[in-house]
Amino acid sequence: MTRDIVIIGGGVIGLAIAVELKLRGAEVTVICRDFQAAAAHAAAGMLAPDAEQITDGAMKSLCWRSRSLYSEWTSKLEDLTGLNTGYWPCGILAPIYEGQESKGVRVQEGEGESPAYWLEKAAIHQYQPGLGEDVVGGWWYPEDAQVNNQALARVLWAAAESLGVELKDGITVEGLLQQQGQVVGVQTNTGIIRAEHYVLATGAWANELLPLPVTPRKGQMLRLRVPESVPELPLKRVLFGKNIYIVPRRERSIIVGATSEDVGFTPHNTPAGIQTLLQGAIRLYPQLQDYPIQEFWWGFRPATPDELPILGTSHCPNLTLATGHYRNGILLAPITAALIADLIVEQKSDPLLSHFHYSRSQKQASTIPMLTHSANFSNGHTKNPPLPTLDSPLIIAGKSFHSRLMTGTGKYRSIEEMQQSVVASGCEIVTVAVRRVQTKTPGHEGLAEALDWSKIWMLPNTAGCQTAEEAIRVARLGREMAKLLGQEDNNFVKLEVIPDPKYLLPDPIGTLQAAEQLVKEGFAVLPYINADPMLAKHLEDVGCATVMPLASPIGSGQGLKTTANIQIIIENAKIPVVVDAGIGAPSEASQAMELGADALLINSAIALAQNPAAMAQAMNLATVAGRLAYLAGRMPMKTYASASSPVTGTIS
């Protein structure tokens, strides 16, 4: 587990991540240039994925998930601090003007969908008295809500402080120190700050530190005060109009916002901006023209070209990105904190993160590499064109991999076949039996020279070990073997404890004992296990980097015989799940990935094929296809037929 973490940015996103990481046991430092300048102070606090009419499917899902967390999340923060966040599930009313949108009844189907109700003119004016005469109807979004954004920022700061997060306000970050693909420190105006892991959450200023497509979008806002002559708060819900929103607060203030101006970091309110806000607000709710103005302010939202956030891994394995939230930073704070903490602490990447990876803006990153080198196959198979991807890298023990297929080196008829197959598989991790290399077992001679270990990550395994003590000893040898091949920082080990010579089933007790010791010694342990959900959980709890449940006995080629248990493991694991052993055909590889497995390890099915290199490529394609299918989401199964072609509106 990564414990020492520096978060660059002290806005709502950075503080939310800091609190979540601290609650999970990490030591966290937050570096903040100016807490009062954070975009959170210039927001209105709407939690409005429905009213915003977000059309991107992944973004909508992210927003809905975050909104569903809000009640429990704010309660937790309030319990930690004794302060009020102003969370108010008041719903949002979206009035419309003539010609703005056609009327009708919105029908939303499917689990997780939010309801929306159309109100005719008479109904909406009765429901919310005082609306402008131009309002001809509107939508009611009962699940949207609001939070007092400024109160939330203060509560998050107080929560972080109370938990022991080190808060460094007034510190300017001048750059990220990088060496050999890692961030090794943060250069600030007061010196260098170092950690094991770093999180970039600097909002609109992200581009100052990394070449990310994040630009400032200025927003002007104002606050009105409900006069004392008005006995009750006239608005009990947010009004969301065309290019304007009106947000009532229970302490009798009303927020009006917001402009959206592409003017860089140009400061200050402008007469034109304030006039636009007042005109829009008064047209929507005319009595505001008589309310006193308390204050004006402005802020800078972090915008991206597609208006989606940038979340997840970066070009450095110890740098995580959480920026570009644009209009939805307040809304997305709880889900961002949870997903980023999962990624850093548990090395578990939620499939949703793949949609928000920084590489989506780079043309060259819009494909999955199928083959890393050219390969000549005897049957004429050639390198396939790359496929489009929604995916983010596989992360194991903080190290990123693009391929989700791992392979081995055993059972091949020749070194040449093994070399061709490794290349054809596109894999980045190859497991090697330490004992067989040490004893120069036939087929394992010359492995050090056979593969390019500068491009392939070695996964030493303890195959042949029958006890925990033996496996621990061989794991130590494996680490030294990796160092001899130039992988000085390789602490990976595939743990196998197999006393059963007939069925080659792993010993759960010995595996757990060995795993506990190896984790204490600093190994990233990848244990091979029966598909036992309870054992998988115990191994996760002791600190293993992955779990590797078998699909069926080693080398049997029986395919997926443990599907139900593997599904349970996948649903409950917070570390990567790698299905290992027994897969015999590409269709089975694809099926395992469709279940939600994070990766596969396949050796026998490739090595024992009539054309190993071609089978390696097929397994690569199947792994990619299964992963894409899992991310895309399977259509629901039905007990009845549903015509693919329309039965009405056809041309006769």
Curated annotation (Swiss-Prot):
GO molecular-function term, one example from the UniProt record: thiazole synthase activity
Catalytic machinery residues: 494
Keyword annotations: Cytoplasm, FAD, Flavoprotein, Multifunctional enzyme, Oxidoreductase, Schiff base, Thiamine biosynthesis, Transferase
Reaction(s) the record says it catalyses: glycine + O2 + H2O = glyoxylate + H2O2 + NH4(+); [ThiS sulfur-carrier protein]-C-terminal-Gly-aminoethanethioate + 2-iminoacetate + 1-deoxy-D-xylulose 5-phosphate = [ThiS sulfur-carrier protein]-C-terminal Gly-Gly + 2-[(2R,5Z)-2-carboxy-4-methylthiazol-5(2H)-ylidene]ethyl phosphate + 2 H2O + H(+)
Essential cofactor(s): FAD
GO biological process, any: thiamine diphosphate biosynthetic process
InterPro entries the record matches: Aldolase_TIM, FAD-dep_OxRdtase, FAD/NAD-bd_sf, Gly_oxidase_ThiO, Thiazole_synthase_ThiG, ThiG
TM region positions: none
E.C. no: 1.4.3.19, 2.8.1.10
Protein residues bound to FAD: 5-19, 44-46, 173, 325-331
Xref: SUPFAM superfamilies: FAD-linked reductases, C-terminal domain, FAD/NAD(P)-binding domain, ThiG-like
Residues annotated to bind 1-deoxy-D-xylulose 5-phosphate: 555, 581-582, 603-604
Database matches in CDD domains: ThiG
Chain residue ranges for the region called ThiO: 1-366
Residues annotated for glycine binding in this entry: 52, 301, 327
Start and end residues of each stretch annotated as ThiG: 393-652
Superkingdom of the organism of origin: Bacteria
Subcellular location, record wording: Cytoplasm
Pathway the protein acts in: Cofactor biosynthesis; thiamine diphosphate biosynthesis
Function, as annotated: Catalyzes the FAD-dependent oxidative deamination of glycine. Is essential for thiamine biosynthesis since the oxidation of glycine catalyzed by ThiO generates the glycine imine intermediate (dehydroglycine) required for the biosynthesis of the thiazole ring of thiamine pyrophosphate. Catalyzes the rearrangement of 1-deoxy-D-xylulose 5-phosphate (DXP) to produce the thiazole phosphate moiety of thiamine. Sulfur is provided by the thiocarboxylate moiety of the carrier protein ThiS. In vitro, sulfur can be provided by H(2)S.
Family statement: In the N-terminal section; belongs to the DAO family. ThiO subfamily. In the C-terminal section; belongs to the ThiG family.
HAMAP family xrefs: ThiG
Quaternary assembly: Interacts with ThiH and ThiS.
Name used for this protein in its record: Bifunctional protein ThiO/ThiG
Annotated gene: thiO/thiG
